[in-house]
Amino acid sequence: PLAMPLASLLWVSVLLGQPQPQPLCTTAEVFLRDDRRMAAIVEPDTVDDWRTRKRVAGCRVTAAGGTTRGVQAEAVGFYERVRAVGWVRTPEPRDAPSEGSLRFRSGPADCLFNVYGAAMLNTDAEMLAEDRRPLVAGETRYHVYVMCLPVMPAAPRDSTPPRPR
């Protein structure tokens, strides 16, 4: 009689130890792996959402790739390609274009993409992505970090408090 509950508990512990699918990040992950030929690591995430002023369950993708044209040119080409494959800018995107971050929408997800050069997050995911995508001769390392949240309407223009000066 005790064997069945114990077996069930063991099965649950195995399932909990497995990476869980992150459907909000699926399109971004596939794009990074298949189109951009990057190694991509997907993880669950909780993000402070400016639209709702709440913590929202989402996911993140940490990817590593190589470029022969330099990181800045790669970033420009990257965002052109994001648009070409069907991602659209989110309504009233609040992103950081001077920092290389742009927010796009595809299907059920609003995702903030950030393109950068050398490793700077110092996370296990960043190191694992680099290990999975070695550079070949003539390539320079670049990374993409993506945070995805469920699609939501844009916040009213007066809903965000002004930034302190």
Can you describe what each PLM-predicted range is?
Residues 3-15:
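Sec-dependent N-terminal signal peptides
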Residues 16-165:
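An acidic-aromatic pocket/loop used at catalytic or ligand-binding sites
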